[in-house]
Amino acid sequence: MVSAAAGWAAPAFAVAAVVIWVVLCGELLRRRRRGAGSGKGDAAAAARLPPGSFGWPVVGETLEFVSCAYSPRPEAFVDKRRKLHGSAVFRSHLFGSATVVTADAEVSRFVLQSDARAFVPWYPRSLTELMGKSSILLINGALQRRVHGLVGAFFKSSHLKSQLTADMRRRLSPALSSFPDSSLLHVQHLAKSVVFEILVRGLIGLEAGEEMQQLKQQFQEFIVGLMSLPIKLPGTRLYRSLQAKKKMARLIQRIIREKRARRAAASLPRDAIDMLIGDGSDELTDELISDNMIDLMIPAEDSVPVLITLAVKFLSECPLALHQLEEENIQLKRRKTDMGETLQWTDYMSLSFTQHVITETLRLGNIIGGIMRKAVRDVEVKGHLIPKGWCVFVYFRSVHLDDTLYDEPYKFNPWRWKEKDMSNGSFTPFGGGQRLCPGLDLARLEASIFLHHLVTSFRWVAEEDHIVNFPTVRLKRGMPIRVTAKEDDD
């Protein structure tokens, strides 16, 4: 973990950025503390508001939130207020908006399960600029359900899982064999390289080559703008990211046009674009499809590689878990070799302890710390009023690290999932409701395949590395491990 000193020194730059952000965002000035109420102003409504404070004028409690986010324990912001107010649901003022923060599993589940008649997505302005109005993250109602359903169905398809499994095996085997004994393998870097190209092929059908490399470079330029200041002047971070997105969109829309021109009516979808254009809806325009293909590339750059990297870190720190995972995977490999069969995606997903390791990594790592929604009407839940126009911050991290829900929550313990129920609302690493991440099965599969090939190919000694939690979760050094190849009879 990052030292406490480093965790609290780093926010100096972030604090400056946040101050500029809040000053520049017009919405901040429109939502002063007194103007952020329910709009009714009556004593009864005020009494039902969650306990809490709006903090400082204009900036609210944003600066302390960001400072905690950079520390080894980002949940300290929420934990402090839970104790102070005696409630896991409290009010605050974050990123320019009056906000209800919930670390209550029941309230969080209610918000996630609610539809656009109660809550709609809310994101920082720079992110909404980059995502575009057609993004699955921002659209609502029937169109959102249609896009989510089509993409989710394709991601769950045996065709895509079989293709992804073969592609990962084809990429991982030579990549891992290129590391000689005692060399350093940076897990995060390798995972990003492998996962991105494979997922892009599944999304838009693009094969490895010059265009893939150009797309990868443009995507790198695009993604760093997601948490930038909302200034679109030439030369700014947001402007450069928007220009990169335009270049990606031109490539993807060309692919869409080519696919529409040659598409046979009865052909099976080979990628996500095929699935969407096959729906035949006039609402699924080329712009909407390209926007969503770009959005769906984000897990390949961010969440899936980080999931893999965190799993390796946690396993390296828990030799007993690493040994059990090795044994499970080696036994599967031997059994399939003796049968003369190639591992299929169902084989990887059948590895029960490997799945427990991935689940525990998701809980402890909290790759997605939480989500924000905006109330479109007054909403009441568990006696708390969330006024119309307020944001609600569903903070997954505090729920996943709640000692009333998990014994020794800061301990990596994959065995806890042998008996634990994942459907009770206290485990939500992929969100929930109509906006449940459509790629959750693929994320598990990719992590399972990577871990299988790693533990059956190498022994390793991990070098020291630290988790950085803000603005996104990552390993500071990319998780370097010093590898030694295993013999076939190991």
Curated annotation (Swiss-Prot):
Q: Which residues bind heme?
A: C437
Primary residence: membrane
Name under which the protein is recorded: Cytochrome P450 90D2
Its GO CC terms are: membrane
Q: Name one Pfam family in it.
A: p450
BP GO terms, sorted:
brassinosteroid biosynthetic process; brassinosteroid homeostasis; sterol metabolic process
Q: State its cofactor.
A: heme
Q: Which PANTHER family match?
A: 3-EPI-6-DEOXOCATHASTERONE 23-MONOOXYGENASE CYP90D1, CYTOCHROME P450 26
According to Swiss-Prot or TrEMBL, what is its membrane topology?
Single-pass membrane protein
Q: Where does it live in the cell?
A: Membrane
Tell me its family. Belongs to the cytochrome P450 family.
**Role description:** Catalyzes the C6-oxidation step in brassinosteroids biosynthesis. May convert 6-deoxoteasterone (6-deoxoTE) to 3-dehydro-6-deoxoteasterone (6-deoxo3DT, 6-deoxo3DHT), and teasterone (TE) to 3-dehydroteasterone (3DT, 3-DHT). Involved in the elongation of leaf sheaths and stems.
Reactions this protein catalyses = 6-deoxoteasterone + reduced [NADPH--hemoprotein reductase] + O2 = 3-dehydro-6-deoxoteasterone + oxidized [NADPH--hemoprotein reductase] + 2 H2O + H(+)
- To which species is this protein native? Oryza sativa subsp. indica
Pathway noted in the entry: Plant hormone biosynthesis; brassinosteroid biosynthesis
Gene name as annotated: CYP90D2
**Main EC class the enzyme belongs to:** oxidoreductase
Q: Name one GO molecular function term.
A: oxidoreductase activity, acting on paired donors, with incorporation or reduction of molecular oxygen, NAD(P)H as one donor, and incorporation of one atom of oxygen
Which EC numbers characterise this protein's activity in its record? 1.14.14.-
Q: Which UniProt keywords apply?
A: Heme, Iron, Membrane, Metal-binding, Monooxygenase, Oxidoreductase, Transmembrane, Transmembrane helix
